[in-house]
Amino acid sequence: MSSVVRSGRISVPALRARKGGTPIVALTAYTAPMAGHLDPHVDVLLVGDSLGMVIYGFETTLPVTLEMMIAHAAAVVRGSSRACVVVDLPWGTYRESPEQAYRNAARLLAETGAGAVKLEGGQEMAETIAFLTARGIPVCGHVGLMPQDTLMEGGYRATGRTEDSAARVLADAMAVAEAGAFMIVLEGTLEPVAAGMTRSVAVPIIGIGASPHCDGQVLVTDDMLGLYGSFQPRFVKRYAELALTVAEAAACYAEDVRTRRFPAMEHCYTLSR
């Protein structure tokens, strides 16, 4: 059964129209409670396949399944009412053919009520993006550093370090935009290259490890809140240290239980007088 999309959400055309205007604010969300906390403050809630690492403890995003993405995206839609919900198509669900991509994207949107899908890839994915958009599937592109290519690349490496690399990233973004993507995430790309791309490409460029001159920014929420491990990518600014708060709260709770300070009588049910 599909989720119901509530009225009042930021639309795909509204996001596309933000090119060169007030920067678009995006954060990841994987659960209904977090979506509810973030929704008043952001324009886009990205249900990223990063949930494989953040929620499930995988080393990469590659083990994430379509069923996982559907379950989490539906929760985010239920927990929010304002932001546009964009959902990653996971590895292995869209590169075989445009028809495979359409089948899985249509299922994802129908079963979750999300507003758009996101897929990784440049010039080689232009045909697929055009196929999807021609059939009513809004697509957000993703170029530059592409986490789903980690097997081919041997890890995570910033792009745009050479003239050839910079030209390739720009050509990828241009191809994705011309194919019909309404917005493009640009990840892990040298700042001058990212700034120039933002000026050159007709649709909003959302940076993550890119440039302050992009049309918007996205971060993994757990990174931004200091919840996800000790490793901090260079491009992350921590706005809180919630891992410490959680640890302190758990320690206080454990001490109260062991010393029988919790539960106190006010936490117990008693007969009314």
Swiss-Prot record:
Pfam families: Pantoate_transf. GO terms for molecular function: 3-methyl-2-oxobutanoate hydroxymethyltransferase activity; magnesium ion binding. One of its GO terms (biological process) is pantothenate biosynthetic process. Keywords: Cytoplasm, Magnesium, Metal-binding, Pantothenate biosynthesis, Transferase. Its EC number is 2.1.2.11. The keyword Chaperone does not apply. Binds 1 Mg(2+) ion per subunit. SUPFAM superfamilies: Phosphoenolpyruvate/pyruvate domain. InterPro entries: Pantoate_hydroxy_MeTrfase, Pyrv/PenolPyrv_kinase-like_dom, Pyrv_kinase-like_dom_sf. One of its GO terms (cellular component) is cytoplasm. NCBIfam families: panB (TIGR00222), PRK00311.1 (NF001452). This is 3-methyl-2-oxobutanoate hydroxymethyltransferase. It comes from Granulibacter bethesdensis (strain ATCC BAA-1260 / CGDNIH1). The gene is panB.
